[in-house]
Amino acid sequence: MNKNNIAVVVGGTGSIGAALANELKQQGFSQVVTLGRSSQPMLELTNEASIEQAAMFIKSLGKPICLLFDATGILHDEQNNQMPEKTYKQINLSFLKKNFEINTFGPALIIKHFFPLLDSEEQSVFASLSAKVGSIADNKYGGWYSYRASKAALNQLIKTASIELSMKNKKAICVSMHPGTVTSKLSKPFQKEGLTIQSPEESAKNMIQILVNLKSQDNGSFFNWDGKKIPW
């Protein structure tokens, strides 16, 4: 991976996104760009035009992307007092739609508009924040219908995109990442005793360490924060 090219973090103002951007700088990436609702240009996941404009801005910088990290996601909606479902009786259509808009549709549009900007000659990496509960094979406890389903759909997008990406550049890598339980606004209501809880900085360091050491055979994989692969 050529660290002199551009590293992009979408969702770079969130707890994990900001920590990822800082870690990339510490790892020697020369140009790290963060994009989100408060960036210039603005990138809003539910607005495809803004995603396209943000991609055009990156293209105008004149260098390819060596690493693209989608650090976006929603688990609960504080504004509307909506939390992950404990039972199918709590399924709410608007909350279900919102989970898919942020966790699935947004990343799909990032893939659409940013993949053409990935380095086509040297190794490039695209990583998207998923969640272990999005694994169908690992679902042992049920619940969290909207979040699980939207992250499972994201994982299918990542797996499918990894196949097409490798056809254009054998060195390109596309993976899903589970950051672990992190002290962030997203996961704060769900932290409990017995869980390994990391700071955003710890999680970012662990994930970047994985990404900079990926091999071509890792393309299309789902990684836990500790480097172990998670079944789809």
Q: Which residues are covered by each model-predicted region?
A:
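Rossmann-fold scaffold of SDR-type NAD(P)-dependent oxidoreductases
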Residues: 10, 63-81, 103, 128, ...
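N-terminal Rossmann NAD(P)H-binding glycine-rich loop of SDR-like oxidoreductase domains
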Residues: 10-25
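Rossmann-fold cofactor-recognition segment
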Residues: 36-54
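Conserved amphipathic alpha-helix within the SDR
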Residues: 51-63
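Hydrophobic positions on the long internal alpha-helix
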Residues: 106, 110-114, 118, 157-158
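C-terminal helical subdomain
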Residues: 176, 184, 189-232
